[in-house]
Amino acid sequence: MVGIITRKYIYKGWNKKMYEVFADLHVHIGRSENNKPIKITAARSLNFANIAKECRDRKGIDIVGIIDCASPYVIEDIENFLKTGEAYEIKDGGIIYKDKVCIILGSEIETSEKGLNGHCGSAHNLCYFPHLEDIKGFSKEMSTHIKNITLSSQRANISAYELIDIVEKYNGILVPAHCFTPHKSFYGNCTDRLEKIFKEKYSKIPAIELGLSSDTFLADTISELESKTFVTNSDAHSLPKIAREYNKMLVGDISFNELLKALKNEDGRKIITNYGLDPKLGKYHRTYCEVCGKNIPGNAPVTVCNTCDSKNITMGVYDRIEIIKDKEKTKSPEIRPEYVYQIPLTFIPGLGKKTIDKLLDNFGTEMNILHKLSKDDLEAVVGEKTANSIISAREGKMTIQAGGGGVYGQVKAC
């Protein structure tokens, strides 16, 4: 058994103990160790080694998916990281860092799709692989379909229908990314049904990523998603944003194989809780008028600005789902885990960097602060007002102003 000897014991079955672990499966890399650009919009400090350390020392994340590992620069960093002895690959897939964190090697690929009304659309796909040799092979093959394989989230000259075969060739799985956002997603600008994209291969997809502007209650108004596991991930472009959304899983160990079983709900492995932002905090929750420069009020779906009559809008996720849903009311399958609205520490009014650092120095990880500590524990370190804010955020008692048009929503103090 690797890396989880301190995890909470749940029950014994299949001759194996089961554990609750936290997973964030969508974290970007900003720069390589040699300062080569990977994700242009991501922080320079966001490199492979720093992500592993952040997850272990500050966030309390047990499984992290780093989705820029197909870049040759990152592959070189991984090889050098393994040589330090701080991390090692395991047979069941994944890289274990200091016996605490399992790193899943991934790649975000933008595919070219026949979009809505015949126009050319594009969507992001999260591709995960068990071993370094698998992603090295994937990287080499994808370099024939992508102009610059060294950069993150580059557009390939193939469709997702074709991509999934290449992913499987290298023992990987494909998960559609932030499925509802207006840019670079399947439901947002390519289709009203994933089955139209993947056709007979649709059953090969174990899960979809909800994205920051949606949640289980919105997604479960679409019938074809009843068979898919929902994952909530951070899409982090900086170290502090890791685990702004995450999943609690029940697994027998931390590895690629155990993660895959959890996504497929096999052998008792499963996601037991999705922790996500209230979708109103997302950047694209409501429709935004590009002329007026503000969200458009009114009942969804909003497709025209009711102030200036402009159609120059960025469609909101909530509005888009209202258009494509095929259920009048949300109805989730019995296997669907609980969705818990989560406000990260960085979103809570009054919590600056110094206060967050003080909390982490005293209590270890963000998971401890968000889930486990009592008000008295918090108050002893940061005072009554800040402790009340953290508890209010935990209990969903804060007011939220909806985001849209690429601008995050805002949390208002009670």
Model-based region annotation:
Residues I29-S45:
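Acidic/histidine-rich helix-loop elements
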Residues K228-R244:
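Short acidic/histidine-rich active-site segments
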Residues K270-P337:
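Cys/His-rich short segments
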Residues K53-V74, I173-P176, A207:
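Divalent metal-dependent hydrolysis catalytic cores, especially in the metallo-beta-lactamase
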Residues F22-S32, C69, T232-H237:
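Histidine-centered catalytic micro-motifs
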Residues I296, Y341-F347, D357, D376-C414:
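C-terminal extensions
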Residues R7-N15, E20-A23, N34, I75-P206:
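Extended substrate/RNA-proximal surfaces in nucleic-acid metabolism proteins
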